[in-house]
Amino acid sequence: MAIVKCKPTSPGRRHVVKVVNADLHKGKPYAPLLEKNSKNGGRNNNGRITVRHIGGGHKHHYRVVDFKRTKDGIPATVERLEYDPNRSANIALVLYKDGERRYILAPKGVNAGDVIQSGVDAPIKAGNTLPMRNIPVGSTVHNVELKPGKGGQLARSAGAYAQIVARDGAYVTIRLRSGEMRKVLSEGRATIGEVGNSEHMLRELGKAGASRWRGVRPTVRGVVMNPVDHPHGGGEGRTSGGRHPVSPWGMPTKGFKTRKNKRTDKYIVRRRNK
């Protein structure tokens, strides 16, 4: 994988930094694992904006990724690595010995031709998926299940991982990249190793248009809006906003805690690092 800095042949190219992976598949994705992915521009069924900064962007299909990894005891060979426009991580197309193909998150160090496996008897090797009760303490994992059988929900983006730091009865304690330590059920599954494409964080889009290609619209500051649009809006000339920073709906921002799910507080051993 190479980091390529573009020559400044135009203002839009001057700051572009690309991450080039020669191992990625150059052709089309595997058609049976594609689904329609319609755009909604951040609008709900009433046509009102519910998520800002969404709109436009290149058309693409959704790749059906197997986050559950429940095909136990059947080895699978990695056929190829592919780019996925729906996530920062790359994905791998694997062929099981019974002939079925699936997409999985491409772990770091796993390449075409490697053999992976799922189940309680799977060896501790990058790309293999096991219940966390069978994974040694200290191991690095990704695609961690919060609820057994639901599929992995934690540590799925490029370069992400969690570490198993303790095991206590029905629970294991994991440390996340944010510094948070939390308990999860030991029956839940996780995949050994960390997610690949960790160089994703080094890329520079270089221009606003590159964000628009990805369906991301501009973020406008509240102080330049009108009073009808934002609590910081209005005033004659440039103003400081006149109050502590808030969201467009009046909720304090910049450090204000918004976590509401008290039901799961008991599973958080230590809050994330600030």
Curated annotation (Swiss-Prot):
GO terms for cellular component: large ribosomal subunit. Residues 223-264 are annotated as: Disordered. One of its GO terms (molecular function) is structural constituent of ribosome. GO terms for biological process: cytoplasmic translation. Pfam families: Ribosomal_L2, Ribosomal_L2_C. InterPro entries: NA-bd_OB-fold, Rib_uL2_dom2, Ribosomal_uL2, Ribosomal_uL2_bac/org-type, Ribosomal_uL2_C, Ribosomal_uL2_CS, Ribosomal_uL2_dom3, Ribosomal_uL2_RNA-bd_dom. Signal peptide: none annotated. One of the primary rRNA binding proteins. Required for association of the 30S and 50S subunits to form the 70S ribosome, for tRNA binding and peptide bond formation. It has been suggested to have peptidyltransferase activity; this is somewhat controversial. Makes several contacts with the 16S rRNA in the 70S ribosome. Belongs to the universal ribosomal protein uL2 family. Part of the 50S ribosomal subunit. Forms a bridge to the 30S subunit in the 70S ribosome. This is Large ribosomal subunit protein uL2. It comes from Vibrio campbellii (strain ATCC BAA-1116). The lineage of its organism: Bacteria, Pseudomonadati, Pseudomonadota, Gammaproteobacteria, Vibrionales. The gene is rplB.
